[in-house]
Amino acid sequence: MGIEFNHLYVTLDSETLESIGQSEFISQEFCTISRDTVKTDTESWTGIYLRGKHSYLELFPPGGAEGLRESFSGLGFNSQQAGQIDIVKEKLRSLLGSKEILSDLQVRQTEDGKVPWFHYLSINPAEREAFASWLMEFHQDYLKYKNIKLTSDGCFDRAAYLKSLDTSETCLFDDVSEVHLELTLSEQEELALLLQSFGYESSCEGDITTYHSHSFMIKVCQKVAPRYRIRKVVCTLKEQLQQEKTFTFGKNAQLNVGNSLAIWEFG
């Protein structure tokens, strides 16, 4: 099934967030960076966006969205073709038992009024959780509004979507290939069910469970009380760098860049 990783978010302390936002390397070489406020018909959020060719990172301050506290984080996925979200929904229903599925249409507030943005699906949380994961299926009205073209075989194109947001074509950041998580037992169980409904395969080695599909991988280590859920993010680069560099941002973020990878560490 054509389910892709789309983006992730991490909630950072203000000092760390501002250090990233003021970095010349981040803004001039690594990625397209912007401070944005997004409004829907039910909520709004404000954060720093680090955009690459195929995926992006949302970095929030505490309270950047309602209920967010430092270290709260999440992973967002997208379907490639219309109707795939319904297939996932049926698979989830057969896996979940008594757990509820949360699904709805997100409507975006734009300069031209309200535009249907994407359908989303997740395992229903009782309240804002420290870790979230969800699936999006972008609405045809929004793709038309932003003039985002599908591929020749009718698939959603992450690069075309990000290009519509004025993402630089010369920045280093290409895609996210790996995310390393520390999750509680219940958080891992819910993520595993969602990934299973996407068609991900899994394997275990020691205390690490790996979930993978195509060129994307998630590694999970189970913890009783993890401080940060997203601990490491491996990004692919468009070109190989000969000189390795390390950048430290505040107390809770570090970026190691070298060869064809950039590795973020949080917490």
Residue ranges and their predicted role:
Residues 1-18, 172-183:
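Terminal, regulation- and interaction-focused segments at domain boundaries
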Residues 5-7, 45-47, 72-74, 176-178, ...:
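Extracellular structured ligand-interaction cores
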Residues 16, 80-84, 184-188, 237-241:
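Helix N-cap motif at beta-to-alpha junctions
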Residues 18-33, 88-94, 185-202:
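Amphipathic alpha-helical segments
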Residues 32-73:
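Glycine/small-residue-rich interface belts in oligomeric ring/scaffold proteins
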Residues 65-78, 224-229, 241:
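Long, folded non-catalytic interaction modules
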Residues 74-93:
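Long, charged/polar, surface-exposed segments that mediate recognition or autoinhibition
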Residues 90-175, 186, 198-267:
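Vicinal oxygen chelate
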